[in-house]
């Protein structure tokens, strides 16, 4: 049975705090032998509450030597009129998230998910490094621009979902051309 679903995304921190965008490849990155930036950075003080981008589930929790403490969640977004579920990863967090969340826990969009920090060797000071893609373990899998995904659904959009696997976006019926 079809049901109506409203999809909305949220910036994890104030958009005015964006300090480095996806795909940038400035002189500092080049001097360090790094490729283009694989995420979106929000310059925030350590301990700043970070919001869940959308309603979904916790998909992965852990720590890497480079990106520090992290949590990855799934969240629906609408891209080019199509509902897609993406993975969003929050990195350089203040602490291990396994004390607060378990894989599979539901997450509500806009709620406090975690707190920013400065963990991991790649951190250049307190900030959130946000990544997005299709699969968990975003540090080693293909990524895409998180800002484009967030901004596509900042305004709530209601869609009709036929079943969990086959969402359908209802579009207004096309107007028939007037007869001459």
Predicted regions and their residues:
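Surface-exposed, glycine-biased beta-strand/turn segments
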Residues: 1-69, 78-80, 108-109, 122
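Acidic, glycine-rich catalytic/binding loops that coordinate metals and/or anionic ligands
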Residues: 2-14, 83-86, 99-111, 127, ...
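Conserved beta-strand positions that form and line the central face of beta-propeller blades
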Residues: 41, 72, 89-92, 115, ...
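Gly/Ser-rich catalytic serine loop of serine hydrolases
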Residues: 45-49, 94-104, 117-120
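Sec/Tat-exported extracytoplasmic proteins
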Residues: 46, 62, 117, 150-154
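Zn2+-dependent peptidoglycan hydrolase active-site motif and core
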Residues: 53-100, 126-132
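Acidic glycine-/aspartate-rich tracts in secreted/extracellular proteins
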Residues: 63-64, 120, 135-138
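Short hydrophobic beta/alpha edge segments that flank linear recognition/processing sites
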Residues: 70-71, 107-122, 130
């Amino acid at each position: 049975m079809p049901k109506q679903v409203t999809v909305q995304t949220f910036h994890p921190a104030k958009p005015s705090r964006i300090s480095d965008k996806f795909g940038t490849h400035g002189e500092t990155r080049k001097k360090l032998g790094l490729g283009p930036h694989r995420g979106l950075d929000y310059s925030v003080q350590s301990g700043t509450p970070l919001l869940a981008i959308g309603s979904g589930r916790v998909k992965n929790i852990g720590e890497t030597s480079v990106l520090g403490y992290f949590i990855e969640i799934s969240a629906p977004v609408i891209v080019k009129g199509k509902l897609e579920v993406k993975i969003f990863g929050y990195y350089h967090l203040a602490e291990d998230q396994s004390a607060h969340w378990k894989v599979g826990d539901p997450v509500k969009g806009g709620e406090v998910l975690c707190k920013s920090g400065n963990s991991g060797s790649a951190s250049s000071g307190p900030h959130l490094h946000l990544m997005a893609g299709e699969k968990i373990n975003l540090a080693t899998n293909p990524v895409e621009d998180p800002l484009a995904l967030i901004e596509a659904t900042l305004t709530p959009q209601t869609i009709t979902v036929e079943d969990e696997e086959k969402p359908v976006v209802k579009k207004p019926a096309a107007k028939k051309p007037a007869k001459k």
